Amino acid sequence: MQLLIPESRIVFASFFIFGLLNNILYVVILSAAIDLVGSATPKATVLLADIIPSFTIKVMAPFFVGLISYRTRIWMLVGLSSFGMLVISLTSDESINAKIVGICMASLSSGLGEVTFLQLTHFYQREYSISGFSSGTGGAGLLGSFVFMLLTNMLGMKVWVVLLLFAVLPLGFLMAFYVMLPKARGGGGDEPGYEALDSLDERSDPSSNASFSSSQTVSLKGHVVSTIKNILPLIRPYMLPLCLVYVSEYIINQGISPTLLFPLDELPHWLFSSYRDIYVVYGFMYQLGVFVSRSSISFGIRIKRLYLLSVLQFANVVITVYQSVHDKPFSSVWLLLALIFYEGLLGGFSYVNTFMSVSEEVSKSKREFSMGCVGISDTFGILLAGCINWSLEPHLCSLQVNRGRDWCLNGGSA
């Protein structure tokens, strides 16, 4: 098979699957947030459970992840994500604490997976590995939100059944890693020679001397200080603008959008049978925008002014807050859906262009480490947004209730 298909396409497809599977459960969980905790509970509850474990492991990863082989990490991803989805889907609606535990397990898998696969791109041509992974993460958002919307909004399937179906998807990691992925190329794809995948694993294996020589005993304090010094130069050019974009977009997605509601009798019943359905459709339009923009590198589109994207995304926060409070400037859900799509475009552009900039501008010797570290910033942004949304959503909802619109309290029913 590999003799008939160009290796570049196989690399792209492998990393596309990695990105797709790594992010799709995260997207589905957020799409189901209103079903998991109900209308009265801030959706930030699910967002924080879905992001704190991921953020924690991303922060800790630079200090220990190099000691765990890529093969071991793949099996960890499968176990954590599949079991987590089983817990979420099979526990009763009243067992919110148990569902939160399942969400946390899936979140750990997502965080470890992003660090792992971004580091793995270092061993392949970035035009195909980064582009494939980025497109896959965008595809996860689009596929996950669309399938969830299709099965629940349109076909009327029980939410727990839909979540149970998604529990089998992580097995695809094994196929992509062991069957599809070609042998690793040394030095980020810029050198002609290849190294076997076993050799790649040796450099991340605690029993190997490739990562730490027995003659080079480094104290824990020295290792931490050295790691922090390597992280600091990445903050201003890459991590901060990406973080700011994610703060803004997740304030919109989980804090503001549950209050951006319209009369159900003015909406098509085949798509919107309850106020809860509006939230799900917003999620799909956002993910559609993310998918389009995260795939933009494949078409040669590059945006290097990363802070511009941060400013534009914050403007969307201002617009949507105004809409929630005053029901202006949008009088139709369709115009608001277009804005949500644009919001997704900005988020996707920021993600893919940030990692492309790291790949192009950071020295080869530090590139693998840097790719893993910069991934912390988007998760930190989502974490900040979750903390803000904890009070923002209830406040916006109370303002609407005070003027006679209690739709935000009825997300699960018409």
UniProtKB/Swiss-Prot annotation:
The protein's name in its UniProt record: Protein BTN1
Residues of the signal peptide: 1-33
Gene giving rise to this polypeptide: BTN1
UniProt organism field: Debaryomyces hansenii (strain ATCC 36239 / CBS 767 / BCRC 21394 / JCM 1990 / NBRC 0083 / IGC 2968) (Yeast)
Domain of life: Eukaryota
Cellular localization per UniProt: Vacuole membrane
InterPro entries: Battenin_disease_Cln3, Battenin_disease_Cln3_subgr, MFS_trans_sf
Keyword entries, A-Z: Amino-acid transport, Membrane, Signal, Transmembrane, Transmembrane helix, Transport, Vacuole
Pfam families named in the record: CLN3
Function per UniProt: Involved in vacuolar transport and vacuole pH homeostasis. Also required for cytokinesis.
Membrane topology recorded in Swiss-Prot or TrEMBL: Multi-pass membrane protein
Disordered: annotated span: 195-214
SUPFAM superfamilies: MFS general substrate transporter (SSF103473)
GO cellular component, one term: vacuolar membrane
Family (UniProt): Belongs to the battenin family.
GO BP terms, alphabetized: L-arginine transmembrane transport; lysine transport; regulation of intracellular pH
Transmembrane segments: 48-68, 74-94, 100-120, 137-157, 159-179, 242-262, 281-301, 306-326, 332-352, 368-388
